[in-house]
Amino acid sequence: VSQIAGEPGSKDFVEVRLPAAGAYLSVLRTATAGLAARLDFTLDEIEDLRIAVDEACAILLQQAVPGSVLSCVFRLVGDALWVTVSAPTTDGRAPERDTFAWTVLSALAGEVDSSVADDKTVSIALHKKRGAGPGQL
């Protein structure tokens, strides 16, 4: 865990980079659970986040460039966890927001957003605050 300069102790971040392949997603699920536990999330909140991160990664892996790297940045800010997963993609399309997968993400993580960089890297950002019910910030 590293600290972001400027605000000692209030913003920590962890970055995990791994091959963009489903076989490695267990690493991110474990990291998600560990970091959410560090913020004293409930067991239900931890499980919701694990599933949300897994789903976000699954969405990205469908269009990831073969042999590329999946990046996951966790930011711990107060009683909230921000998770951003990103991968270079073949087509640079943002995930459709009217899909079942997006509905699941929104229900489990609270706030969900996506972006596409000029180099066709697609990112999905999740935000969950401790104590917020499903689908709430």
Model-derived features with residue positions:
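Bergerat-fold GHKL ATPase/HATPase_c domain
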Residues: V1-I51, L137
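Conserved ATP-binding N-box helix of the HATPase_c
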Residues: L43-P66
